[in-house]
Amino acid sequence: RTDRMGRDERNDLLARIRGQTVLMPNMRPIFEKYIGELNPNYQALIPVVNRKLESLEPNQKRLAKLKKADFALFASNWWPHADFDQLRIVTYLAIWLFLWDDVLDEPTGEYADNFEAAQLYRKETVQFLADTLGLSISKEISTVVTYSFSDHVKVLARQLKSSLEYVLALHPSENDYMKRGGFVAGLKTLGKQLESAVRWGLRLRPTKKSPPTASHPIIEGFRVIGEELKTAYTVEQRQNFFEDLKFYISTTEMEQRFHLDGKLPTLKEYWEVRMGTSAVAACLAMIEFTNKIKGPYQSTNHPLLKTLSDEANIIVVIANDMLSLKKEIVQGCLDSLIPLSVPVYGGVQQAIDQAHTDLLAAVDRFDAEAEKLLSGPNTTGLSDRELRIFVNGCRDCWVGNFNWSLCTGRYGLGVIDQKSGSFHLPL
């Protein structure tokens, strides 16, 4: 009965929205006061992205749709200062986040209507992320196995001592072997043992085999990202990134429950979920990577930086949910900001106007927080230069997301006249 009531509520709301034409307010002044640059590697990245998509999506119709979204443009807007190699990896991350989520929440998604299968998909993903990032999961807490430098020195010393004793026939048990094998054989053995000792001391000893191929190609697609970050990031940075990804994955569970139960979430419930499903935090955690910053940093989860990260997240979500409204209504998706605001504010236009007001307020809060961070004492652990890069990187992301949203074929706004800033949008 509850399920039927929820579906009736959804159908009524969809009928209330469809067929209307609304005025999307001019958001350009909010974003254009900041320079929205485009990464100069954009054109070179397009064929790389197309090859990546072709390797992940066998369905030609869906492949064409994905190419139309222009992920190269997305990444080039979000990370305008990244070198090509770094830009390629963050673009792969953007693709991975979009595709991983589509399996669960698109109407045609593989596990959209199968919660049990979706849970297995989530569980395997979390484990695969940890493995590829060089982290191990234990009792829901991620740790990494490391050895101190002194441990390596002790092991190296023991192996060198053993090797020298062996070749010089100082070890009683090995005298007979030396006599039988001769001095050359002893030298060969010494060489092998020295190689082993040095490899251990330099942490070049054989490592565990990389995680086996994931059961789903989308999950497997994260491997190249994780392997890159194992070199580029410290344990702390990888842990921070992993926490943001885990939050993203966990909130998709709540989102799917709403969908399957037929229940429309309240605005409060929506925001609790959307702060994770937006995946903005995980993208902001790559600012250090795109700027080649390596250190024991938390960035997006640091108590002093989380407010800034959260405001950037809110800005991206509001602007995204406004500009993707047409796409969502065409697909019959109501779990986004504007549709859920309609019953609260009395209509679609009123919901859009309120979102615009909230967007302006979020930008003001972001600017105030950025000013506070950059003008006050720096106790974030980042250097002053690194802190400024992170703050500016957060701004690049929400400015870039707006510019991409107006151009991407994913939202279907390209054919609409946007020159005046505001535009009419038929739903």
Regions found by a protein language model. Give the residues of each.
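Alpha-helical, largely C-terminal catalytic domains
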Residues: 1-427
